[in-house]
Amino acid sequence: MNGVINIYKNTGMTSFDVVAMVRRVAKMKKVGHTGTLDPAASGVLPVCLGKATKIIDYIMENKKVYRVNLKLGMVTDTYDLEGEVLREEDASHITKDEILNCINSFVGTIDQVPPMYSALKQNGVRLYELARQGIEVHREARKITIYSIENIKIESNDNIQMDVCCSKGTYIRSLCYDIGEKLNVGATMTALERIQNGTFTKEEAINIEDLTEELLEKHIISIEKALDSFEKITVNEKFGKLLRNGVKVFDNRMYSEEVEFNKLYRVYEDNGVFLGLGKRDEKGFKLEKLLIEE
């Protein structure tokens, strides 16, 4: 069985728990998820089976949409409710307009410092392992992109909800923390749900608790379909043969569409055969991942 199943992970489970359950149902070992969701978070977790494990890294590049709840006036060491409260502030004076203006100021490409409680490594040691020892180290800010923040609901300063569309590598806990710091009262993430990963949506996801062999076979998505978030280009069979053989082709006649530099595309021959994912640079166009079904 080769393909991707759109799974909904419940709170309290690790992402590896989901993989283990899919392995049991599918009766196969070659299974992997496409981006960790913390146990306290829920939501969309595409799981790749068989040859589809080759495209895990590409699905992880997708834009993600998270539904997040945060509380103003409280800061924890983990930036969420799992951690120890470090400080509390009175946030009752913060107005809705101030909150909205602050939240919207984070839209765009920004520098974000990852939290200490994260799986990133420093000198070979995971940051959360250092944090558990009470050690805090300097973390370099990383460029991330917040594409949009929509559906902002301010029920009270204790409960603000918003939908955040962001790039790979974004820490929503850090976003909440940074919003709180900018408002000078602190903030903590209180709930997190991933509602979309590229073309994989919450509405179409299968709850991991409901997964059966029959549901898996019915809803598994082909490798080709799972890459729908990448734009499509078509080449003729002559150039297709060169690409299949790993040749980098420098010839603008090979594609009819406008092809940007350093951008991944789904590549098809003009007879409809899906070849894989390719990228153009100054020296030509080459398949980065050959995915043709033999």
Curated annotation (Swiss-Prot):
Known catalytic reactions: uridine(55) in tRNA = pseudouridine(55) in tRNA
UniProt keyword list: Isomerase, tRNA processing
Keyword Cell membrane: no
Gene it is expressed from: truB
Biological role: Responsible for synthesis of pseudouridine from uracil-55 in the psi GC loop of transfer RNAs.
Family assignment from sequence similarity: Belongs to the pseudouridine synthase TruB family. Type 1 subfamily.
One GO term (biological process): tRNA pseudouridine synthesis
Pfam families: TruB_C_2 (PF16198), TruB_N (PF01509)
Family matches, as InterPro entries: PsdUridine_synth_cat_dom_sf (IPR020103), PsdUridine_synth_N (IPR002501), tRNA_psdUridine_synth_TruB (IPR014780), TruB_C (IPR032819)
Protein name per UniProt: tRNA pseudouridine synthase B
Keyword tRNA processing tagged: yes
EC number(s) stated in the UniProt entry for this protein: 5.4.99.25
Listed GO MF terms: RNA binding; tRNA pseudouridine(55) synthase activity
Enzyme class: isomerase
Active site per UniProt: D38 (nucleophile)
